[in-house]
A protein has these predicted regions:
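ALDH superfamily catalytic-core signature
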Residues: 186, 203-210, 214, 224-226, ...
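Short gly/pro/ser/thr-enriched loop/turn and capping motifs at secondary-structure boundaries
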Residues: 195-197, 244-247, 279-282, 464-468
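Hydrophobic/aromatic ligand-binding patch that stacks against planar heteroaromatic rings
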Residues: 178-179, 228, 418, 448
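Active-site-adjacent "gating/activation" loops or surface patches in catalytic cores
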Residues: 125-170, 174
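N-terminal Rossmann-like NAD(P)+-binding subdomain of aldehyde/semialdehyde dehydrogenases
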Residues: 1-142, 179, 192-193, 205-210, ...
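PLP-dependent aminotransferase-like
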Residues: 159, 171-223
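Active-site proximal loops enriched in glycine and acidic residues that flank catalytic Cys/His/Asp
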Residues: 164, 191-193, 219, 238-241, ...
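Conserved C-terminal structural/oligomerization subdomain of aldehyde/semialdehyde dehydrogenase
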Residues: 2, 17-34, 153-156, 161, ...
Length: 566
């Protein structure tokens, strides 16, 4: 536990570090990031073991794959993306020189974030991601502004506090690197107490930045966080967590806090950015699916809810289906089975059991699924009613099914309206659609994507893929304010350091290989390693991480061999 004296000392160190960082050239900034990248690779095993310890996972569980894929793997990819951007800036060119730029709906530009290079094409074949810029941003201005704070490295922006997340272990490191390189701040990283087990390994991987007094890592409870964010030496705060925690920081708690929020009079006297989750939808467009399609996509949706035990800010919580879809019941039966049969794991996140009980108390008719009955599936929800599931992020294995009485294009339009208007938050939305359905909708399908007000939209993929894509942006849809924060303000990741970002759009294959190839969809990716029922996820995740630490052609066959057995 950190006391106020230690905090004062850490902030004094960072104050000195900021002055030195302002004089540090781009080449040296890149070199220190390369050392961090190397250290993440060297300590990846320790990183995963620490994560497994506080999540109470057995060392031989396939679920360890989640810790590789959401821990050192994206941290390595994020550092590598920033290194590439720094190299471009050093050379006097734009980070997006040579990157594919295309038109997107509504007068927008789309910057290709995935694939970025031949290895992406091979390892995530069939997946793509684009960063859509805000309407009116042209290619010339996008190129000029890419690089953000590293375009004027001497103009540092003070000390930033990063309040780390308690669920995914790459979030705090990635947010820290983003604040340093995008925003040109030095950083006091305060860990969520749930993740205190990560303190030793984080100190090791950040050692090059700690030695320069650019980073300090602190632990402690809410009292430490409160003292830290309100400290006069701190110029900015970034939090990953809940809107409730955000509002407590900005306005205080209790009736006084609520009154300050209503009056738009924050207690926090400095800017704050945030990533806060919400109620994420999965819109299932009706079509003619095979039995294998129904089973695979049911496992896909179950993964969107149950990955990391259900403790993800972008976990799906509301599945939206057409009540008149002939295959609705078959899909829901497959979804029940997928949720019920997913591997058992401990409920490590505080308050999870209480949140599951709260959902069940509202809907005692709901199904209790899983080996211990700890997962709740609530069917038959109706749009337009006062339904807690649509307004409350449960952050637990709770999934609702909303039925809309429409078909075809009308269903698609109404589902987008429902997601935009009735669900809390704007972090991520998923769409599942047969390729023939997408083709039949034509240009109107792109209009559906444009109309969804979400920071990441995934078509036949989980929005979590956007989180894993280092060059993609990650954050809420733009426009929220501190008194109506919803899923947050600002963004992170964004490996090209783009300005004027609106959203990321991810696309994936409707079917895994080899079935995708046999049915005419050229995508070579088998069942993804982030699926909760993937039997070789731990091996694949470890091999992908080792590859990302030190890429090489000779490492690819072993990755493919493991992935194909999943």
């Amino acid at each position: 536990v950190t006391d106020t004296t230690e905090i004062d000392s850490a902030l004094a160190d960072l104050g000195r570090g900021e002055k030195l960082w302002a004089d540090t050239p781009l080449s040296a900034r890149r070199e220190v990031l390369e050392r961090v990248h190397t250290l993440i690779g060297e300590h990846a095993e320790e990183w995963v073991a620490a994560a497994a310890s506080f999540k109470k996972l057995s060392p031989d569980s396939p679920l360890i794959g989640e810790e590789w894929m959401s821990g050192p793997y994206p941290a390595l990819a994020g550092a590598a993306a920033l290194i590439g951007t720094m190299r471009k800036l050093e050379a006097g060119t734009s980070p997006i020189d040579g990157v594919r730029i295309t038109d997107a709906p509504g007068g927008r530009l789309a910057i290709q974030a995935l694939p970025h290079g031949i290895f992406d094409t091979l390892l995530l074949n069939g997946f793509s991601a684009q960063v859509w810029l805000q309407p009116g941003v042209d290619a010339a201005s996008a190129r000029r502004s890419a690089g953000l704070g590293q375009r004027t490295p001497a103009a540092t922006q003070g000390i930033g506090v990063v309040l780390g997340a308690g669920n995914i272990t790459s979030i705090a490191p990635l947010d820290t690197l983003y604040d340093i390189y995008a925003n040109n701040r030095v950083v006091a990283l305060k860990l969520n107490p749930i993740t205190d087990a990560m303190f030793p390994v984080f100190n090791k991987v950040f050692a090059p930045l700690i030695d320069l007094d650019v980073v300090r890592i602190l632990t402690g409870g809410a009292d430490v966080g409160t003292y830290l964010v309100n400290h006069d030496a701190v110029s900015h705060v970034h939090i990953t967590g809940s809107a409730i925690t955000h509002d407590a920081i900005v306005f205080g708690t209790g009736e006084l806090g609520e009154q300050r929020k209503a009056d738009r009079k924050p207690l926090l006297g400095k800017p704050i950015s945030s990533e806060l989750g919400g109620v994420s939808p999965t819109i299932v467009l009706p079509g003619k699916w095979s039995k294998a399609d129904l089973k695979f996509q049911a496992k896909h949706v179950a993964t969107q809810r149950l990955h990391n035990g259900g403790y993800n800010c972008v976990a799906s919580q509301a599945v939206v289906v057409s009540s008149s879809w002939p295959q609705k019941e078959a899909f829901l039966e497959a979804l029940r089975d997928a949720i019920d049969q997913a591997p058992e794991r401990p409920a490590y996140y505080p308050g999870s059991d209480g949140r599951v009980k709260a959902a069940y108390d509202v809907h005692p008719e709901a199904e209790r699924l899983g080996p211990s009955g700890g997962r709740v599936l609530i069917e038959g929800l109706i749009a337009g009613r006062d339904e807690p599931l649509l307004r409350t992020e449960y952050f637990a294995p709770v999934l609702g099914v909303v039925e809309l009485p429409y078909e075809g294009q009308e269903f698609a339009d109404k589902a987008v309206d429902f997601a935009n208007d009735e669900l809390a938050g704007t972090l991520g939305a998923n769409i599942v659609a047969h390729p023939a359905t997408i083709k039949s909708l034509g240009d109107s399908f792109d209009t559906l994507i444009e109309r969804l007000r979400y920071g990441t939209i995934a078509v036949n993929a989980w929005t979590g893929v956007g989180f894993l894509t280092a060059h993609a942006s990650w954050g809420a849809f733009p426009g929220h304010t501190v008194d109506d924060v919803q899923s947050g303000i600002g963004l992170v990741h964004n490996g090209f350091l783009l300005d004027g970002v609106e959203r990321t759009v991810v696309r994936g294959p409707f079917r895994p290989a080899p079935r995708s190839i046999l049915t005419g969809q050229f995508a070579l990716t088998p069942k993804p390693p982030w699926f909760v029922d993937n039997r070789t996820a731990a091996t694949t995740g470890r091999r992908l991480t080792n590859f990302t630490a030190s890429p090489g052609w000779s490492k690819l066959p072993a990755i493919f061999a493991s992935a194909l057995r999943g």
